[in-house]
Amino acid sequence: KSFDRAGVPWFNSPLMYKKGQMIETELFDTADKNRCVGKLEDGICVFVEGTAAVGDTVRAEIYKTKKRYLVASLKEILKFSDRRTAPRCKYFGLCGGCKWQHLDYSEQLRVKRKQVLDALEHLGGFETPEVADCIPAEEIFGYRNKIDMDFTDRRYLTADEMNIPEAELSKPLDFALGFHAPGCPFKAIDIDHCDLASEEMNLAVETVRRFCRDRKLSIYSTFTHEGFLRNLVVRRGERTGELIQAPPEFMLVI
């Protein structure tokens, strides 16, 4: 009987799997980095990245093999978990901001508490630490008082836009003001509306977008190192007890 370097029999080792191989598994737990955990029929542990949820049965593609586990990216959800909810944001799954909008809010709180427990146990070395339940937020949308967006001359295209001729696209390719997609530091999604920001902040962003785009103001390029516009910061402050008497104050930094 042959063994790998970790002492695991080859017939039951993650090293028998290959990058690019498709696997199917039911997810039973959560882990760090917004990953879910599943086990294959041979007992191999797999961490699945993407908008998955505990209780999902998924098809995923392996992209990393370790001595004790596999890491895979979500490709298809075969059976949906009852812990899911419909994401409110139309950019969810593309935008690198929100990670858990596909989870019911009570499930989000459970996952956050578990992350604290895991950190205390596995990193801190505490045995059976006591961690109270998470205190729910009063508002889960429209609560942010600051958003920081990037200008880019390379707009991120959705899968649907990839099949549309450039002349028929509703937005130009060389302008975007928004957030980066995961793994795309040089491209940004042109965000029309962020559900975490207030309506006033979204209006401010849209005003700046139209002003800069219509006047064709130059955007800084990370490739040529030329251009002017790089970032937009919108901050909203409300004085305690003066919401009716005084309007909110804004700060825009370009």
Residue ranges and their predicted role:
Residues 11-254:
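Accessory RNA-recognition modules of RNA-modification enzymes
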Residues 1-15:
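N-terminal amphipathic/basic-hydrophobic helices that include classical n-h-c signal peptides
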